[in-house]
């Protein structure tokens, strides 16, 4: 029996993670896909999330146990610090938002809950993350201990101002907003975490989206880095946060 697969589509806000995933999913079987923003949007529109859509069958006790975990408590505390309440219940395998008004922390918490239980059942899945917090690295380490083959698809631009502009364009088209200061702060935090994540996963694919189109610039497998473009074409973010460790 082959190992379950976990694919992580990571990069700063506005880098093009969703666009990259959409292109990838047209060519490959990605398993179950988790995107906290899409979960938040579905919760806002419908008021609930049907867990059967993710191949899960869970009870309220499963959710109660989950929210006592360190990562869940940390997320809930962040929500409280920003004056957001999380009031979610699990009834007949459906997560119901019992609160007034949906916010991003609910989408993030539910995504974390789903990842937790998909791992427990060794189900193939992939998820999007900004990867601005080192907890994501620990999460991948745990998946590997459970036998998962892990893949990182990392996409970035060479300037957070590009990301800010693209998020603004996304909002104009009806997409979700992220505060400019958060985009900038997360951009640098994400890059700080990049090499630590690279050391954990089995394979990495690096994409640059600084220009008009997404470009695959490098691959990493078995600690061997192979460039897909000329060295002179490599963006600064890759040179400073990945390449320098392999030359």
Give residue spans per PLM region.
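Phosphate-binding P-loop
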Residues: 1-4, 117-119
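Short hydrophobic/aromatic beta-strand immediately N-terminal to the Walker A/P-loop
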Residues: 6-8
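The conserved Walker
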Residues: 12-13
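Conserved glycine(s) of the Walker
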Residues: 16
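Post-Walker A alpha-helix
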Residues: 20-21
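Conserved substrate/cofactor phosphate-moiety recognition/catalytic segment
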Residues: 25-120
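A glycine- and Lys/Arg-enriched "phosphate-lid" helix/loop adjacent to the NTP-binding pocket
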Residues: 145-193
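NTP-dependent small-molecule kinase module
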Residues: 196-247
